[in-house]
Amino acid sequence: MTKKIVAIWAQDEEGVIGKENRLPWHLPAELQHFKETTLNHAILMGRVTFDGMGRRLLPKRETLILTRNPEEKIDGVATFQDVQSVLDWYQAQEKNLYIIGGKQIFQAFEPYLDEVIVTHIHARVEGDTYFPEELDLSLFETVSSKFYAKDEKNPYDFTIQYRKRKEV
């Protein structure tokens, strides 16, 4: 297996990715996809995103936090203060690294991304955090996508799009 750095996120039609440091929707099928994709790999997020998840660890995933606070110590979590230290850690690994947010973390890792996995929620929801416009998705070509219709458990239609970085 060739390891890779992948950004994975969900957004609504306006680019909303969060509200009050949480996901502003509940889509069990999308959460299941996230789980299956990231299982047995490493996930990286900012400390604010980790706080928004209630500081709970996701099972069978190595959790990495990027924080400005060098004193931040969290049981079961590897903490880093800068992008380069995360990249140095990654070089010694055999697993994928999934960048799961928030906005500043996506921006910081854009130059290093091999792939992106975007869930496009076909609705507009209320939110206060938007996916960074600075991240240039034109650098990535769509390789596949899968549509999910809303149902009794998932209140919105959504499409999961898989993109890989274009060859230069």
UniProtKB/Swiss-Prot annotation:
Ligand binding (substrate): 8-10, 30, 61, 119
Chain positions recorded as NADP(+) binding sites: 9-10, 17-22, 46-49, 66-69, 83, 100-105
Effect of residue 65 to V: In strain: 92
Superkingdom of the source species: Bacteria
Effect recorded for residue 70 to S: In strain: 21, 56 and 1/1
Any one GO cellular component localisation term in the record: cytosol
Residue stretches making up the DHFR domain: 4-165
Record bears the keyword Coiled coil: no
Molecular function terms, GO-annotated: dihydrofolate reductase activity; NADP binding
Listed CDD domains: DHFR
Catalytic activity: (6S)-5,6,7,8-tetrahydrofolate + NADP(+) = 7,8-dihydrofolate + NADPH + H(+)
UniProt effect for mutating residue 60 to Q: In strain: 30, 56 and 1/1
Pathway(s) per entry: Cofactor biosynthesis; tetrahydrofolate biosynthesis; 5,6,7,8-tetrahydrofolate from 7,8-dihydrofolate: step 1/1
GO biological process: dihydrofolate metabolic process; folic acid metabolic process; one-carbon metabolic process; response to antibiotic; tetrahydrofolate biosynthetic process
InterPro entries named among the record's database cross-references: DHFR (IPR012259), DHFR-like_dom_sf (IPR024072), DHFR_CS (IPR017925), DHFR_dom (IPR001796)
UniProt keywords, alphabetically: Antibiotic resistance, NADP, One-carbon metabolism, Oxidoreductase, Trimethoprim resistance
EC nos: 1.5.1.3
Entry coiled-coil feature ranges: none
Family statement: Belongs to the dihydrofolate reductase family.
Misc remark: Strains 1/1, 21, 30, 56 and 92 are trimethoprim resistant.
Role summary: Key enzyme in folate metabolism. Catalyzes an essential reaction for de novo glycine and purine synthesis, and for DNA precursor synthesis.
Protein name: Dihydrofolate reductase
